[in-house]
């Protein structure tokens, strides 16, 4: 991410942990992005003029006199019809070798819908899988968890749901995937000729675990765009939530915090 010449540069970090660094700064907002010694970071705590940044790649190699530049914005996603059929990382950048997305830039992680104002869920989302449609029915507007042992083929089940679901768009959020898992989904969707209605946000095991925490917000921001702006039926698939919980544990450990079970 490029920085602008007029942005203030801070060079005095007061505290560094394995995942965060703290410094005194002014005019900074919560969730704002920053560059710390060339590494992308995000504001996670503000107490007066003391700002704590979570560094996505970890703080290894960052000195106390490192240059810190705040970017003046929180994580965003460019939304348009061009998202369809593409694969992105946790920051919404293409990872499939295709062109950059042109569209409206919207912040992720916005306020959730007031549940009192929502309509009663009643519309079936058919998957063509009897065990799901009859015993664990997907209904538009609801969240349904799927539990599986590590040795069960849950990726194949997720791919089948994506291909068979009677929806306009499928948003896949992959967290902690192996490269084999990523290539499996990419090849299955491509071979089935279904890429034009599937949008994928992927964090692999080669990426920093902290980035997994952005995947659900990216996926839901894209889903909201197609559902609200285009009145389309959208199904969001997030896999796997165990990796998401592991990322929370890793972040808490690196921030020298005691992990509370309430977080997961």
Each model region followed by its residue ranges:
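P-loop NTPase nucleotide-binding/switch module
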Residues: 95-142, 158-160, 196-205, 211-214
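Conserved P-loop
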Residues: 153-196
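Phosphate-binding/switch loop-helix module in NTP-utilizing enzymes
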Residues: 212-247
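Acidic-enriched and Gly/Ser
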Residues: 2-8, 12-127
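Nucleotide-state-sensitive switch-loop elements of NTP-binding domains
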Residues: 179-222, 254-257
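Conserved small/polar residues in nucleotide/adenosyl-binding loops
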Residues: 262-264
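Loop/turn-to-beta-strand initiation segments
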Residues: 169, 197-199, 231-235
